[in-house]
């Protein structure tokens, strides 16, 4: 049996929560299981690791960085807007932005999902639509909280893959496919540092990658949901882990 301790070490950013009145940081099982099934070893990254001296010690130990989805939203002031964000998680913002900047500099692979994509957009100088529901010309991209979870994560709309990017290289035989949709915010302005990898039928950005980086991919949908059952989701996670293995080999050559 393969020794999981030999697998690429994937740092997973945690999310703020409360448990019986205590400040807590959590991760949902589906995000962790998707990494394990793809051949990675996930480790939880608490927000205190944003402290620069700790982050500097942490980064050489990571072979990849994984930014999962979350009920929280990125604070508006980080992309130049005013107003409060009732569902903010400042600790996650601080750690995610620091990790993204460090990973881009050190060429550490990144896989970002939902909120993670939005963090990638903001960290590279872009901005977000804060309330998609106020734009009637758009599809409904939020989940229905009254439905069972299995139905909330069911395919909701198609995405069209842009040619010539990372996503089309991972999925060369699949230029469009159906995805789930569980988000109320979205990329608004995308930095020139990013390539738009896919769009929904209403034109919204559904995937981005960082130009001139070996693997820094963000997707707006949730491929972690039952990832081992869907070939397209498996390909994305396995592509991420393969990139992490290449990063290990590159570190060993230096």
Regions found by a protein language model. Give the residues of each.
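Phosphate-recognition beta-domain surfaces
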Residues: 195
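The feature captures the ABC ATPase H-loop/switch
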Residues: 117
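N-terminal beta1-alpha1 cap of cysteine-dependent amidohydrolase-like domains
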Residues: 1-111, 121-129, 133-171, 178, ...
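Active-site-proximal beta-strand elements of phosphoester/diester hydrolases
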Residues: 217-220
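Conserved G/P- and acidic residue-centered "switch" motifs that form tight phosphate/ATP-binding loops
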Residues: 114
